[in-house]
Amino acid sequence: MKRINWGFIGCGEATEKKSGPAFGEVPGSQVVAVMSRNADKARLYAERHHIRKWYTDAQELVDDPDVDAIYIATPPSSHATFAIMAMRSGKPCYVEKPLAACYEDCLRINRISEQTGVPCFVAYYRRYLPYFQKVKELVEDGTLGKILNVQIRFSAPPREFDNAQGSNQPWRVQPLIAGGGYFYDLAPHQLDLLQQLFGFIIRAHGYPANRAHLYQAEDTISASFIFQSGIPGSASWCFVGHESAK
């Protein structure tokens, strides 16, 4: 089996707790270099996980001949920059969701991937978890009957520090960094799972609002959409719900 040597751009929570550990545990995969603009953060991460190299410059990591592929685990505002950098260097990349902070950047990433022939994957790993594989099986074998309509209803109370000011606010509610609010962080997985079950969403309408005014980004979203299969769907997300929504 060919071994893939990964380079990480970003040394935050995603690489520490969520996806990062798996890169060193899957057969044929290992992490050989990490990068963070914060030198201490990069060095300590590398030491903690026994990784040989660390960088503070993304281009240097991408240019490292020992690195075969790139995992991009930074906030969405930099996804396009790093993904395009990797693809232009001939290195496939795996990008945390959302793919980018705005639609235009998503188009740029797709265009560069087509031009270079280098793939760029989004971290929609949940579709491969056993639970969701079982759901897919139940839908496809007819156990659940004919699916006529799909609904998403999500509500959660505000998180700690959501009403903080300036740089103390979570980056996930700062549009210049995240692209939007928590919707950008949480909804992609839900919509991806539905698309795996019912085909691509071919038409959609969304209605964002800011109800609580705790931060600049939207905190409530309503949407309607239709899948490739013809099944209609609707959804609502509220990130400033009552405490009972926990």
Regions found by a protein language model. Give the residues of each.
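N-terminal Rossmann-like dinucleotide-binding module
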Residues: 1-49
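NAD(P)-dinucleotide binding in Rossmann-like oxidoreductases
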Residues: 5, 211-218, 228-246
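Hydrophobic residues in well-ordered beta-strands that form the structural core
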Residues: 15, 55, 95, 120-122, ...
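Rossmann-fold dehydrogenase core element
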Residues: 108-126, 146-148
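Core-facing hydrophobic residues within beta-strands of well-ordered domains
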Residues: 3, 29-31, 67, 147, ...
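Predominantly a Rossmann-like dinucleotide-binding segment in NAD(P)-dependent oxidoreductases
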Residues: 126-214
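Beta-loop-alpha module in the N-terminal Rossmann-like domain of NAD(P)-dependent dehydrogenases
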Residues: 38, 49-112
